[in-house]
């Protein structure tokens, strides 16, 4: 049994029609303040709900359930760290951004240190955001390719091109204002999808939800805490601290995530949004872990083979395999597809908008130019960013092997580290620095980190570096900045 491609394509078309309708209803006027900050009128609960979708990109949707087979529920340790990190963002960073009334959060670095720091910060955001958004879209494009477009003989490149084109169409007028709304829609699809999948798979195993929670099969997957050996990559302390810093950087120091928060009416609303969002996120991630366990129980019971990609077994493809090809009916297939597409696009569309915003505000210095000129540059940037995404994804397809979640988090460790160092130094100390040397300090800390990250664990006495790469990298930058401070 397989779902027919025609049904799948119909679902995709209907989904995007829905998005276009929403984007037309929210368009308002075409000016840059709508595109960049939604005229600061977004209702906080919409932002909070939509952010869940953007954080739980396609990666969470496929890789988190897929990783349960090897790491069980240990990812939840990282998630608890996230929760703590969100409190830091809400109580420490948001007040600063609101007080300075920023459009791009990297303007803080310009105010605090100077323009080289500003450009350096924005540059690191650029690299991490482009690769991050491409990772997410790449993952989904591969699933769509493998389960739909191969049968129609449509090459991968075309799949990607169409994907990005669709995003471009519904964001190029409304920008962030549209995205706050479309993300809400996308989060809804994602939640329905995970809940329905849990329900339908339990049903086919003839379990109620409580049967599943109490089952012996679940016990073999539900180990959360790793506290035995500190050398272990997934040790609780390392995962928790790592998770906390991942949030502080990948949310708090990230234009993409903060841009939605800065569209709220006031600091109080933005903080409320952040706290509620973090609690919802923890619950939702736990649902994804439960789903993961369920998928593995189901596949071992019915002998479903995990598909391969480039000759290696790829756990990321287990969920799509079960949803689309295991005879559970069209409903689960359709909800899976909607959830997956929603997950991927809700992070990619905001990435496209935030990259455009960052370029216009941080590099092109548009604030002093005439309004028409600003809009022209913004539109041109938007098109170029879209093309960059397409090219990078096609490069990924030809050169990538590891499981996607690892790749993304390792990469984040290298590119968000300097941002962590710069912001921490700015907030925690009062020193001025020799601005022109900033790029040397940040580049060096990244190079040193890449070297440390590639060391064999035997050198470090069996110590495996995990998620704590990021805080270490930030610390290096921090120390470097102390060295170039003005006496």
Specify the residue positions occupied by each region the protein language model found.
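Membrane-embedded helix-loop-helix hairpins and adjacent transmembrane boundary segments
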Residues: 3-487
């Amino acid at each position: 049994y397989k779902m027919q491609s025609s049904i799948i394509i119909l679902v995709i078309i209907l989904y995007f029609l829905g998005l276009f309708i929403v984007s037309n209803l929210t368009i308002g006027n075409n000016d840059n303040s709508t595109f960049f900050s939604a005229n600061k009128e977004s209702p906080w609960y919409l932002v909070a709900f939509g952010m869940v979708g953007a954080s739980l990109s396609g990666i969470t949707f496929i890789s988190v359930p897929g990783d349960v087979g090897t790491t069980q529920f240990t990812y939840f340790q990282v998630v608890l760290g996230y929760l703590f990190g969100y409190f830091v963002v809400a109580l420490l960073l948001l007040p600063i951004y609101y007080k300075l009334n920023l459009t791009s959060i990297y303007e803080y670095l310009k105010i605090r240190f100077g323009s080289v720091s500003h450009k350096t910060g924005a540059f690191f955001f650029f690299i991490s955001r482009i690769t991050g958004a491409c990772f997410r879209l790449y993952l989904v494009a591969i699933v769509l390719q493998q389960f739909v477009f191969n049968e129609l003989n449509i090459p991968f490149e075309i799949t990607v091109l169409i994907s990005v084109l669709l995003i471009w169409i519904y964001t190029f007028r409304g920008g962030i204002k549209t995205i706050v709304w479309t993300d809400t829609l996308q989060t809804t699809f994602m939640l329905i999808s995970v809940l329905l999948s849990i329900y339908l798979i339990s049903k086919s195993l003839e379990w109620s939800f409580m049967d599943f929670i109490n089952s012996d099969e679940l016990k073999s997957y539900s180990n959360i805490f790793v506290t035995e050996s500190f050398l272990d990559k997934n040790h609780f302390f390392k995962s928790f601290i790592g998770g906390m810093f991942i949030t502080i950087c990948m949310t708090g120091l990230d234009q993409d995530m903060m841009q939605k928060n800065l569209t709220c009416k006031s600091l109080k609303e933005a903080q409320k949004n952040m706290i509620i969002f973090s609690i919802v996120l923890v619950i939702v991630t736990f649902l994804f872990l439960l789903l993961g366990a369920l998928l593995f129980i189901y596949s071992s019971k019915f002998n479903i083979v995990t598909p391969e990609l480039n000759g290696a077994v790829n756990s990321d493809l287990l969920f799509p395999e079960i949803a689309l090809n295991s005879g559970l009916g069209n409903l689960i297939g359709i909800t899976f597809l909607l959830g997956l597409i929603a997950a991927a696009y809700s992070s990619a569309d905001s990435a496209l908008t935030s990259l455009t915003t960052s370029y216009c505000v941080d590099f092109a210095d548009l604030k002093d130019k005439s309004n028409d000129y600003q809009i022209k540059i913004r539109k041109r940037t938007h098109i170029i960013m879209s093309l960059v995404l397409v090219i990078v994804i096609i490069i990924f397809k030809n050169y990538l092997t590891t499981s996607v979640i690892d790749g993304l988090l390792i990469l984040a460790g290298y590119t968000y580290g300097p941002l962590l160092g710069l912001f921490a130094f700015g907030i925690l100390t009062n020193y001025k620095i020799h601005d022109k040397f900033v790029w040397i300090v940040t580049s060096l800390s990244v190079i040193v980190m890449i070297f440390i990250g590639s060391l064999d664990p035997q050198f470090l006495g069996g110590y495996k570096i995990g998620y704590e790469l990021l805080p270490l990298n930030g610390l290096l930058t921090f120390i470097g900045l102390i060295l170039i401070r003005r006496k």
